[in-house]
Amino acid sequence: MIINAKGPASFAEKYIVRSIWENKFPPGSILPAERELSELIGVTRTTLREVLQRLARDGWLKIQHGKPTRVNNFWETSGLNILETIADLNPEGFPVLVDQLLSARTNVSAIYFRGALRNSPDTAVEVLAQIHQLEDTAESFAEYDYLLHHTLAFSSGNPLYVLILNGFKGLYSRVGRYYFSSPEARQLALNFYKELEVLAKAKNYVDVPALMRTYGINSGKMWLQLRDDMPTSIALQEANS
């Protein structure tokens, strides 16, 4: 097992998580005793305890006082905060993960875009006005797209959507820069922003779902044209930090 880590705690965390991912510590199984595991990994028991507590908070493990530490089925117990970790663990499966991520974001964004134009159309108009000064670069479009989603999610009346977006942020910023490296993708997005601005100025939230659905289909087709050429390094968090 080859693990790149910046210190003992990072190494221990990656060792345990990779062992869970590769089914060496399968869901429902009991982790080795603390002393045995610390010797196996090569870290102190104090460091190991800190790592185990952190992994338990993230949903990888279940720790109960007086009982052995049990491995969870992380798909059932973890949150969006492990997306980066999954991408690091499985770069070959990263395109599929991105497909799922974009599909989820498209479905959720249709709700908070409509809510934002209904509850705070002036905020939507204000943030959409920025498209007229938007630089035609991948970086600018990726940053603006996230800003737009974040602003409208917050003004939709349900701040939980912002927390969902925050869970996507790291992965989406990297994928977004790649996606928007395509001039055609930037033009497609710009056309969408302009149509959304028209709806916002008219305070027309009713037609937002149809617009979102059309853009979701078209941007999905664009993504399928780009995904196979996506560098695998995009999946790796540390390679992009």
From Swiss-Prot:
Q: Name one GO biological process term.
A: regulation of fatty acid metabolic process
Taxonomy, superkingdom: Bacteria
Instruction: Kindly name one Pfam family recorded for this protein.
Output: FadR_C
A GO molecular function assigned to this protein is: DNA-binding transcription factor activity
Binding region for DNA? 34-53
All copies of the HTH gntR-type domain together span 6-74
Look up the coiled coil feature and give its residue ranges. none
User: Which cellular compartments is it found in?
Assistant: Cytoplasm
Establish whether keyword Lipid biosynthesis is in the entry: no
User: Membrane-crossing residues?
Assistant: none
* Entry keywords, A to Z: Activator, Cytoplasm, DNA-binding, Fatty acid metabolism, Lipid metabolism, Repressor, Transcription, Transcription regulation
Gene3D superfamilies, alphabetized: GntR ligand-binding domain-like (1.20.120.530), Winged helix-like DNA-binding domain superfamily/Winged helix DNA-binding domain (1.10.10.10)
What GO cellular component term, any one, is given?
cytoplasm
Q: Is the ATP-binding keyword given for this protein?
A: no
Which PANTHER family does the annotation name? FATTY ACID METABOLISM REGULATOR PROTEIN, TRANSCRIPTIONAL REGULATOR, GNTR FAMILY
Q: What task does this protein carry out?
A: Multifunctional regulator of fatty acid metabolism.
Binding partners and assembly: Homodimer.
NCBIfam families from the entry?
fadR_gamma, PRK04984.1
Q: By what name is this protein known? A: Fatty acid metabolism regulator protein
| Protein source organism | Shewanella sp. (strain MR-4)
Q: What is the lineage of its organism?
A: Bacteria, Pseudomonadati, Pseudomonadota, Gammaproteobacteria, Alteromonadales
Q: Which gene encodes it?
A: fadR
